Amino acid sequence: MPVISLGKWPRSEEIQVSLDKSLEVMSNLPFILDVTKDNSHHCASSFELLSPENGFKNWIEFCSRNDNIIPVVQMPDSAKLRDISIQARVLEELKGSIAFRIRNLNTDINKTLTSLVSMNSPENAIVFIDLGYIRGNVSAITAAAINSINQIRTEIPEAIISVLATSFPSSVTNFCRENGQSGYIDVIERELHQNIGGSDVAIYGDHGSIHSVVYDNIIGRYVPRIDIALNDSWYFERRPGMNKEGFIEAAKSILAEYPHYQREDSWGAAMIRNAAIGDIAGMGSPAKWIAVRVNLHLNKQIELSEALQYGFDHDEEDLI
């Protein structure tokens, strides 16, 4: 189930626009709703959702507009523990299921525990421990994650916990092979999950192959690149010095290197096949190909989770 963090929509100062877009994409499926904590991605109306006044009245009313929304309990630094707990209890009563998102391991755990013990049933909540970007610091982050899980389970043994992280870098240049056009990026999220004890300890989660920091759009020349998801890595093809036609060349190389994408039944694979025959209508920008990577990554993680759950082995070709 996705966690969607709302921020400002381009050319709009109304956070409702972002919610409407999210509801449109999700159709009638449930999703977990949060609000960005990055001030640069707020708009005037989104700041109001974080106000602790009247027990977070603005956020509660906002989340009550659709039955498919599972709200994240807001825990800004300005809020008192009592206000956060009241918010959690009211949301539990109104929505049934709620979520907590622990970003700061030093302050958010206590806020979460105080709220969990005040609920009618702590099992109505899922607790996300969001570790952010983990590449280069896996050992320390693993230890911190285990300690956080232990703190929660000591007080609430029945707590439902999921650990979120991402290892996708902000730049792929350090992962290029000698040709400067392709390379592999190792996926660390699954390794982290196993190191903390696997599914017996926490539910697997990640950032969908998105870097943890959202950068504002920078006007300038881009390098066409297409990324695909493998079992334990992302593979990319990039074409420095080319314009959008570089996506066509990258797609051709991906299908030559990994021909199973010729028959994979996913939207992302279909976009790669289209590009390989020269059809990049509506796909001429990097943002479109990030969406392809996310789609392929999510499909791969669902496949891997099902394999782990049911304990069966795929053919080697299927797990490429």
Locations of regions flagged by a protein language model:
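Alpha/beta catalytic barrel-like cores
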Residues: M1-I70, M75-D77, V172-I320
